Amino acid sequence: MYLQARQGCIMRELSSRSVRPRRRKTLQIATLLLASAILRLHRATAAERVDTVPRIAIVSAYEPEWLALKSATSVTRTEVIADVTYIVGSLEGKDVVLFLSGVSEVNAAMTVQGAIDHFKITHVIFSGIAGGTNPGLSAGDVVVADRWSEYLESVFARKTEAGWSVPKWLGKTLGNYGMIFPYAVEIAHPGQSKPEKRFWFDVDPIMLETARSVADKVKLAACLKQDICGGARPRVVVGGAGVSGPAFVDNAEFRRWIYDTFKANSVDNESAPIAHVAYSNHIPFIAFRGLSDLAGSDAGENTENELERLASDNAATMARAFLRDLPARESSEDSSGKTTR
């Protein structure tokens, strides 16, 4: 408001015949600078919709994960907002917007919220790779978790002679890994004095049922590196838990703790925070994760780079089959512009 008022004062002064030419030139430059500042302020503060068509957000973390999806998309246009490139178009008969979140939790949460603010998002889908934690699964398998946790939201406990000492407010936990004691995230809601505590974010049941209905029909690519993958044919596994955190897990002992404690089939960096954002915005969410390895199990170097294309493409294959069968969702908007069920 101050900038706009100041611009008005300058314009009134410019209209005065008593202003000298040099002074007038200075005021003209000042007006242009103020107009530019007002425009930038408007763009920075207003999360304006750039598209009114209801769309499914399809998210991947980094370039290899979305190659197969991007090449299959019929692109209408691209939008660049806050340095994020959004590809607008259609895929498998559905209106979509594709984008890369960037790797890890903050990037994922930030970019997905940005998409929700600027597009009319009806569903959020993640397609990408993950490390396996279930020893019964193999590289190339696609896991579709029914719930997600930010498992490294935690207390690092104090070590005493009697053992680990944790704050009284922590309460009961699922199980610790040394000094690491996981606990629920807190979610603020308008009109509530206390935040909601939530450890698991459930996948939308309709989306999960759709995934189950197509899982057995999907033909995944086989792993050609038998020395790494073994002889198992890749398959889709629907159900079970998944966890996400800021750490790249390449430690077999820690991976075993993840599986024993959370019964998680996979570990990654983005799915749970995206599930968190989707939950807060009342938007259905699901993730398709192709396994690039059993975390920490490689005899030599980590095999993620060797198998990321297989894992990415298999996740994309499942995501496309899912999109074809996903029923349309009626959506409305509340007064804030957020999509609601």
Task: Give names to the regions the model predicted.
Residues 1-22:
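N-terminal secretory signal peptides that target proteins for export/translocation
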Residues 10, 65-66, 105, 267:
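Alpha-helix N-cap/loop-to-helix initiation residues
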Residues 22-28, 42:
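N-terminal export leaders
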Residues 29-34:
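Sec-dependent N-terminal signal peptides
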Residues 36-44:
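C-terminal segment of classical bacterial N-terminal signal peptides
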Residues 48-56, 80-341:
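Glycine-rich phosphate- or other oxyanion-binding loops that anchor nucleotides, phosphorylated ligands
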Residues 57-63, 69:
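Mature N-terminal segment immediately following signal peptide/propeptide cleavage
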Residues 72-76:
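Short Gly/aromatic-enriched secondary-structure transition segments
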